[in-house]
Amino acid sequence: MPTYNRYDMSRVIETYVVNPKYRQVLQLRYVEGLTHEQVAEVAGYSTQHVKSICKNYKNYLISLL
């Protein structure tokens, strides 16, 4: 079973949760349950950028587990 260190987890939290740009996208996508297209419209980003943020966030979390 792979292990993670606290620095890796804090880096993920700092990058995706503390940063307001990413926090808004992640909240709209995972808390509010909006589609990528709806999140892009509300946040003012392209759909591809929203997909990229969500994919990178999930990959970081998966890599830590």
Give the location of each predicted region.
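Residues in the helix-turn-helix
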Residues: 49
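Amphipathic alpha-helical segment used for protein-protein interaction
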Residues: 1-20
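Short, Lys/Arg-enriched C-terminal cap helix and immediately downstream tail that follows
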Residues: 58-65
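Short alpha-helical "recognition helix" segments of helix-turn-helix
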Residues: 38-40
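Residues within the DNA-recognition helix of helix-turn-helix
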Residues: 53-56
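Short amphipathic alpha helix immediately N-terminal
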Residues: 17-32
